[in-house]
């Protein structure tokens, strides 16, 4: 069964809290909550498709999603009068760059963002209100629900999906067969995943059951939280100010990972893995089953026989962390109708099928999960279908809490798997304090 995404309402926040949250992620902005984008939600003079009149548009994206952004921009520029000048900014510098540009009024017409940081921008008025434009699209209800939800602030929609990266279970079919497991039956519960990993690890030599980034907070939220969501639980409250990471279900998840660490079911290096190399182990063919980003699908060797599956919960269910980038029109743009022309085109059948799906990437629409490109490989359909049931967590203090190597989430992770597991409640309170600060 699939665990459905639940719609959430993100209550308004005072300007003091908004400014504090922006500072926490390295932004400096002079915009107040709502900004000039509040009154720009109407469809516009160009109709639902916007205006294509030869305008030059500026667009920013981070290096992590450079390939996908360049492919979309190249296809758009080739087929439209409007032309987009794309600037790719180093990922580690991106938030500071956006913040500085917001403060000086120099944001581009379009800018993408890691979807977990979108709430910081929407609550600070950096994006134009696109509510009416989005809802006028014939496939509006099929747009990646988690991205739309993350970009909704005080009832208005500010962004659309740009690039998608989902957490997915990868498993080695050859190792499954050698361990006496059915290569066509991936685990459907966390308990089965544990059993499969241990059976493969027992093969010995250089073969290992699984792997994970044990010193990587971002890896943890991306691959551990889906097991909690799959059980129908939340990891935070709706407005992202209180953690629920000490629940019985969460404890069950941590216990499995703790068992893998204690019994050396993981490949060497998991304890110290900071995320820089954690996806490089599985392609070598010596790992049985592990969760990874969907974007690694196309990087697998041609001779590696592997399958993909949803990340399961302790007793069943399935979910995924819907990451990647969302994109919107800056509140300072003087070319809203032209910028919308690009966004609307990027979500249409032509771009989603002939650019996104053709490159083996996850499509931004649930109604296109099965298409002429994904149908050639059922594994891609499996990944695409997860979009409908996945989640993107919402919190203004996400970065400082979960991505910062000195943040409280990594401490909770490390204690739960390698340290003093009795500190779980205490560590959960520390996460809540960071979220609400």
What function would you assign to each model-found segment?
Residues 196-201, 239-270:
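Glycine-centered hinge/linker elements that transmit conformational signals in sensory
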């Amino acid at each position: 069964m699939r665990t459905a995404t639940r719609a959430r309402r993100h209550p308004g926040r005072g300007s003091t809290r908004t400014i504090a949250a922006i500072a926490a992620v390295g932004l400096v902005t002079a915009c107040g909550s709502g900004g000039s984008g509040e009154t720009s939600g109407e469809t516009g003079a160009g109709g639902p498709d916007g205006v294509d009149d030869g305008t030059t548009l500026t667009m920013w994206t981070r290096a992590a999603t450079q390939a996908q952004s360049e492919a979309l921009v190249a296809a758009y520029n080739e087929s439209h009068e409007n032309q987009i000048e794309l600037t790719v900014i180093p990922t580690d510098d991106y938030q500071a760059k956006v913040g500085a540009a917001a403060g000086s009024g120099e944001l581009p017409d379009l800018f993408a963002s890691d979807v977990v940081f979108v709430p910081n921008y929407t609550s600070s008025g950096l994006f134009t209100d696109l509510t009416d434009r989005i809802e006028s699209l014939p496939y509006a209800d099929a747009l990646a629900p988690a991205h739309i939800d993350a970009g909704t602030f005080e009832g208005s929609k500010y962004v659309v999906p740009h690039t998608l990266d989902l957490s997915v279970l990868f498993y080695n079919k050859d190792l499954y067969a050698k361990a006496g497991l059915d290569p066509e039956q991936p685990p459907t519960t966390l308990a089965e995943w544990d059993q499969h990993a241990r059976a493969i690890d027992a093969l010995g030599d250089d073969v290992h059951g699984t792997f994970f980034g044990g010193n990587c907070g971002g890896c943890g939220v991306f691959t551990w939280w889906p097991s909690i969501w799959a059980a129908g639980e939340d990891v935070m409250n709706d407005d992202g100010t209180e953690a629920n990471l000490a629940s019985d279900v969460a404890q069950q998840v941590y216990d499995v990972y703790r068992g893998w660490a204690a019994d050396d079911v993981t490949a060497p290096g998991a304890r110290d893995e900071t995320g820089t190399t954690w996806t490089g182990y599985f392609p070598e063919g010596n790992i049985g089953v592990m969760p990874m980003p969907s974007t690694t699908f196309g990087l697998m060797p041609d001779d590696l026989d592997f399958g993909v599956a949803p990340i399961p919960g302790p007793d069943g269910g399935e979910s995924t962390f819907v990451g990647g980038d969302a994109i919107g029109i800056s509140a300072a743009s003087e070319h809203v109708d032209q910028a919308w022309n690009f966004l609307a085109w990027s979500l249409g059948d032509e771009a989603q099928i002939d650019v996104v799906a053709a490159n083996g990437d996850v499509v931004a629409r649930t109604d296109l999960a099965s298409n002429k490109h994904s149908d050639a490989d059922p594994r891609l359909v499996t990944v695409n279908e997860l979009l409908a049931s996945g989640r993107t967590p919402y919190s203004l203090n996400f970065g400082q809490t979960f991505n910062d190597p000195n943040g409280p989430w990594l401490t909770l992770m490390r204690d739960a798997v390698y340290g003093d597991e009795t500190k779980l409640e205490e560590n959960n309170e520390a996460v809540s304090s960071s979220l609400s600060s």
